[in-house]
From Swiss-Prot:
Region (G1): 19-26
EC category: hydrolase
Quaternary structure (record): Monomer.
EC number(s) from the headed UniProt entry: 3.6.5.3
Biological role stated in the UniProt entry: GTP hydrolase that promotes the GTP-dependent binding of aminoacyl-tRNA to the A-site of ribosomes during protein biosynthesis.
Domain tr-type G: 10-206
Binding-site residues, GTP: 19-26, 81-85, 136-139
Molecular function terms, GO-annotated: GTP binding; GTPase activity; translation elongation factor activity
Name of the protein described by the UniProt record: Elongation factor Tu
Catalytic activity: GTP + H2O = GDP + phosphate + H(+)
GO cellular component: cytosol
Family stated for the protein in its record: Belongs to the TRAFAC class translation factor GTPase superfamily. Classic translation factor GTPase family. EF-Tu/EF-1A subfamily.
Organism: Clostridium kluyveri (strain ATCC 8527 / DSM 555 / NBRC 12016 / NCIMB 10680 / K1)
Record's keyword terms, sorted: Cytoplasm, Elongation factor, GTP-binding, Hydrolase, Magnesium, Metal-binding, Nucleotide-binding, Protein biosynthesis
Amino acid sequence: MSKEKFERTKPHVNIGTIGHVDHGKTTLTAAITMVLAKEGKASATKYDEIDKAPEEKERGITINTAHVEYETEVRHYAHVDCPGHADYVKNMITGAAQMDGAILVVSAADGPMPQTREHILLASRVGVQYIVVFLNKSDQVDDPELIELVEMEVRELLSEYGFPGDDVPIIVGSALKVIENPEDAEATKCIYELMEAVDTYIPTPERPVDKPFLMPIEDVFTITGRGTVATGRVESGVLKIGDEVEIVGLKEEKKKTVCTGVEMFRKLLDQAMAGDNIGALLRGIQREEIERGQVLSKPGSVKPHKKFVGQVYVLKKEEGGRHTPFFNGYRPQFYFRTTDVTGSISLPEGVEMVMPGDHIDMNVELITPVAMHEGLRFAIREGGRTVGSGVVTTVSE
């Protein structure tokens, strides 16, 4: 059977459910698909189908993730749900499932628990800026004042991690009651309220095309009589012939040049857009002035940095990672976009060592500067194999 064509009529947004184990993330995911399926905007997915999420490999790390998709009147959503806590940690740090926003599920009967806090912290670190809260299991709480108390606790917790706790939409309901009575308007009302909040509170993300031009350089070659060509996949923005671009990274100084030609599949283009694999002809640049691992970018839009703070997941032995812990001053390679750069690690105060399977904040100092920004993903490698995966949380200098 041929694949269905993806109809792009509505804006697309990636979201996911986060929260403590057994607070009802998967039940809520199933409930959303059931309610929207009645309007032909989703195919109903049962709890068991989501719960036995298939294993996926992202940068060599095994992650269980379930993906469902559905629509509202205004948008198309891809929704991720992870069965285990470790899967969430890996997912959010590796960016295996990018989230534009998240639905934080908190049991009204229990209130915020340790993983509630940990998921909020992770979301703030990896750049998930928008959270909508679903207070689940409200059918198990008789006293409305208790629900109000839990709501206050959740708002305080969100504020503690830099989210606008007072403004975050909080919807109260019971996902299980929805699944048991999908025809009951009173039970399903909470799902409509939740989707309304997600539609309005989580903004449509800026498309890569609308961001400044950036292309990581994968290869460089010379065309006799024409000049130097840099090839790569355009990460964001648009490049037109005659545009001024900057070559950034690996060297202390940036170089400016003009793009005098754009080629794709040996055809000449007027312009290249995010997602295109291209060759860019650069005026007056010598072959030795540019190399893989640098980026071509809109002048002034990116800076090269040597020091940064990263949130890192360290692979377990079973995932092909290290068998032993590492200590302060560990010097692996950091793989950004297209190249490895050696860097040394300093661990947070009070942390003596890092074990395989841990996730941790670390300060890194690279030996040469790399074009980077907050939210950029990287891998940590040792002798060509990946031993960790991370995301830049703060750029220092």
